[in-house]
UniProtKB/Swiss-Prot annotation:
The lineage of its organism: Viruses, Varidnaviria, Bamfordvirae, Preplasmiviricota, Tectiliviricetes. All late proteins expressed from the major late promoter are produced by alternative splicing and alternative polyadenylation of the same gene giving rise to non-overlapping ORFs. A leader sequence is present in the N-terminus of all these mRNAs and is recognized by the viral shutoff protein to provide expression although conventional translation via ribosome scanning from the cap has been shut off in the host cell. Requires DNA and protease cofactor for maximal activation. Inside nascent virions, becomes partially activated by binding to the viral DNA, allowing it to cleave the cofactor that binds to the protease and fully activates it. Actin, like the viral protease cofactor, seems to act as a cofactor in the cleavage of cytokeratin 18 and of actin itself. Induction: Expressed in the late phase of the viral replicative cycle. Belongs to the peptidase C5 family. Pfam families: Peptidase_C5. This is Protease. It comes from Equine adenovirus B serotype 2 (EAdV-2). GO terms for molecular function: cysteine-type endopeptidase activity; DNA binding. It catalyses: Cleaves proteins of the adenovirus and its host cell at two consensus sites: -Yaa-Xaa-Gly-Gly-|-Xaa- and -Yaa-Xaa-Gly-Xaa-|-Gly- (in which Yaa is Met, Ile or Leu, and Xaa is any amino acid). The keyword Protease applies. One of its GO terms (biological process) is proteolysis.
Length: 201
């Protein structure tokens, strides 16, 4: 099941990301229409289907960087194959709406931080956006927020040796939310049930 839009918005509000939050969208995301609101969370499915997989994005105008954080670290081709979703189209739309010279540097996640059967993608996306809000020039690594999770190469994310790392990532993320989101704490049992490490069978 994963996270709902309402849950993500409430958690992001607790994390003080709301001032930067463009919104939550399905795969029809129109692009970055406001430089003052550079952080959307986008689902790979149409909203009427109930959603599939959350991806966080962030636009940093000072250096025309477009950050795309997929907790699985899938390539554009893999996202197209699995979810019929392409971020290159989003990148083109974003360049048209947000950059004077229409030149955007794509910086995407290539490692996996989420377990293969986990439904925690929305929460990991929220963690990334909090990292961006506090460290917009360096949201992917090298700061105390995002460094609580450790990536493994995408091609090895189903290996037995990777699973303890990915499980620890999810536990660290939960602990972060326990310390920083009253909404998460008050709904912890239900959120953990819906985003469990072994939710997808």
């Amino acid at each position: 099941m994963g996270s709902t839009e309402t849950e993500l918005k409430r958690i992001l509000s607790d994390l003080n990301v709301t001032p930067l939050l463009l919104g939550t969208y399905d795969k029809r995301f129109p692009g970055f229409v406001s430089k003052a609101k550079p952080c959307p969370i986008v689902n790979t499915a149409f909203g009427e289907t109930g959603g599939e997989h959350w991806i966080a994005m962030a636009w940093y105008p000072p250096n025309n960087s477009f950050y795309m954080f997929d907790p699985f670290g899938f390539s554009d081709q893999k996202l197209k194959q699995i979810y019929d979703f392409e971020y290159q189209g989003l990148l083109r739309r974003s360049a048209l709406t947000s950059s004077k010279d229409r030149c955007v540097q794509l910086i995407r996640s290539t490692d996996t931080v989420q377990g293969p059967n986990s439904a925690g993608c929305g929460l990991f996306g929220g963690l990334f956006l909090k990292s961006f809000a506090c460290n917009p020039a360096r949201p992917r690594n090298g700061n105390p927020i995002i460094d609580i999770v450790r990536g493994v190469p995408n091609e090895r994310f189903t290996d037995p040796s990777s699973l303890p790392i990915l499980y620890r990532n999810q536990e660290n993320m939960y602990a972060f939310l326990e310390n920083n989101s009253p909404y998460f704490v008050s709904h912890e049992r239900e959120i953990k049930r819906k985003t469990a490490f072994d939710y997808i069978q």
